[in-house]
């Protein structure tokens, strides 16, 4: 017959101790009580909740909007001479200038503050 091996405990069980202080047992469960309060959403008894219903403004009156809304664009905001083509040409010129400066400048794009042109 095979005998069963004895199992060894992995950890030594701590024996309960007598309370030295009145609140010692309460301190041991404080973490669980905090978790429970958070889970319940800090429900307070009704005597601690303030009722503001008598102070609030009863109703707001809506102001009707005009039938014809104001225009978003007028003659001052739109120019007939502006076009995407002129914007693209200006952009191409700026990009070409930047490319030329990076190729010809020995420092590349690195500069000191006293070398910056404003």
Curated annotation (Swiss-Prot):
List UniProt keywords, sorted A-Z.
Answer: Cytoplasm, Nucleus
Q: Name one Pfam family in it.
A: RNR_inhib
Tell where it localizes: Cytoplasm; Nucleus
Q: Which GO terms describe its cellular component?
A: cytoplasm; nucleus
Q: Mostly located where?
A: cytoplasm
Q: What does this protein do?
A: Mediates the nuclear localization of the ribonucleotide reductase.
The text of the family note is:
Belongs to the DIF1/spd1 family.
Name of the protein in question: Damage-regulated import facilitator 1
Which species is this record about? Zygosaccharomyces rouxii (strain ATCC 2623 / CBS 732 / NBRC 1130 / NCYC 568 / NRRL Y-229)
Q: Which gene encodes it?
A: DIF1
